[in-house]
Amino acid sequence: MQNVINTVKGKALEVAEYLTPVLKESKFKETGVITPEEFVAAGDHLVHHCPTWQWATGEELKVKAYLPTGKQFLVTKNVPCYKRCKQMEYSDELEAIIEEDDGDGGWVDTYHNTGITGITEAVKEITLENKDNIRLQDCSALCEEEEDEDEGEAADMEEYEESGLLETDEATLDTRKIVEACKAKTDAGGEDAILQTRTYDLYITYDKYYQTPRLWLFGYDEQRQPLTVEHMYEDISQDHVKKTVTIENHPHLPPPPMCSVHPCRHAEVMKKIIETVAEGGGELGVHMYLLIFLKFVQAVIPTIEYDYTRHFTM
């Protein structure tokens, strides 16, 4: 029944998006939404600091006129996912509801205190000092190499707790190594010894109706065979399956449909973060949008280890 409702909603939103005019004037600070131009600026900032993310065009017939042809959406491929969500130790103490007084019951952050998605707490430490000069401290090993070339100053910010993410010098994961590792584990015997590593392709598009970024993902098994929808749901927080996360067609690519994190709450969450930064005497630049966006959607896909800023300063 929920799938039917999501399908009907999806079709209605497609029509609404088509009829919605393109946002021309910036309303980022007031409402948390962004223009297509601001989306491109934030995307350029993400690509600069995390080169595993790249701009893409998609199908020619699906190019959106309000975005540059070569910058229709962002993509990162072969992102590792080492375990299923049910394998993560759950505790009520780790759960938090963001904006719980809204009609939908709020955004559930299942791993709120683990350091994976502590963005709303961390931004309280941001100050006015060097607020316009931002750089990453630990996006990944590759991002660190990029930072060696950056000479801009940046004020320190309290580091997030490490979440046990596997560091790698590779921009993308070599799935052949995963297969070899799986075979070795299988030979060792025992179901628990098997490395159940999957990989995901992630995409960020601009949603004209909600005027925010939108995250899409599609997964593969160890043999690089596409995962079924039910298998992909295993890597998504169960608080968000079929609610925040639905199955829809990518706006720039051909089928099959992908999992998508619905953007209806993105502007609200971003507005809350902007206000929190302002309360601390800081100012959040729109070019930081996607770095922070990737931070808070990690609550939805906590085991997919994509390239984003775990440590950043302002």
From Swiss-Prot:
Outcome after substituting V108A: Significantly reduces GABARAP:ATG3 conjugation
Top-level taxon in the UniProt lineage: Eukaryota
Short sequence motif Increases ATG3 translation efficiency by the ribomome assisted of EIF5A: positions: 101-103
GO molecular function, one term: enzyme binding
Post-translational modification: Cleaved by CASP8 upon death ligand binding such as tumor necrosis factor-alpha. CASP8 cleavage blocks survival-related autophagy and favors apoptosis. Conjugated to ATG12 at Lys-243. ATG12-conjugation plays a role in regulation of mitochondrial homeostasis and cell death, while it is not involved in phosphatidylethanolamine-conjugation to ATG8-like proteins and autophagy.
Residues joined by cross-link Glycyl lysine isopeptide (Lys-Gly) (interchain with G-Cter in ATG12): K243
GO biological process: one example: protein ubiquitination
UniProt-annotated stretches for the region Disordered: 143-163
Active site: C264
Substitution effect: V8D: Significantly reduces ATG8-family conjugating enzyme activity. Decreases protein membrane interactions. Does not affect formation of the covalent thioester intermediate with MAP1LC3B
UniProt cross-references to InterPro entries, sorted A to Z: Atg3/Atg10
Keyword Lipid biosynthesis: no
Effect of C264S: Instead of the formation of an intermediate complex with a thiol ester bond between ATG3 (E2-like enzyme) and GABARAPL1/APG8L (substrate), a stable complex with an O-ester bond is formed
Position of sequence motif Caspase cleavage motif LETD: 166-169
Modification sites for N-acetylmethionine: M1
Cell location: Cytoplasm
Signal sequence region: none
Motif (LIR motif): 104-110
EC number per UniProt: 2.3.2.-
One Gene Ontology cellular component annotation held by this UniProt entry: phagophore assembly site
Family as reported in the entry's similarity comment: Belongs to the ATG3 family.
Quaternary state and interactors: Homdimer. Interacts with ATG7; this interaction forms an E1-E2 complex that is essential for the transfer of GABARAP thioester from ATG7 to ATG3 and disrupts interaction with the E3 enzyme complex. Interacts with ATG12; this interaction is ATG7-dependent, essential for phosphatidylethanolamine (PE)-conjugated ATG8-like proteins formation and also mediates the autoconjugation of ATG12 on ATG3. Interacts with FNBP1L.
Function: E2 conjugating enzyme that catalyzes the covalent conjugation of the C-terminal Gly of ATG8-like proteins (GABARAP, GABARAPL1, GABARAPL2 or MAP1LC3A) to the amino group of phosphatidylethanolamine (PE)-containing lipids in the membrane resulting in membrane-bound ATG8-like proteins which is one of the key steps in the development of autophagic isolation membranes during autophagosome formation. Cycles back and forth between binding to ATG7 for loading with the ATG8-like proteins and binding to E3 enzyme, composed of ATG12, ATG5 and ATG16L1 to promote ATG8-like proteins lipidation.
Domain comment as written in the entry: The N-terminal region works in concert with its geometry-selective amphipathic helix (AH) to promote LC3-PE conjugation activity only on the target membrane. The LC3 interacting regions (LIR) motif mediates interaction with GABARAP and MAP1LC3A in a beta-sheet conformation-dependent manner. The LIR motif is required for LC3 lipidation and ATG3~LC3 thioester formation.
The protein, known as: Ubiquitin-like-conjugating enzyme ATG3
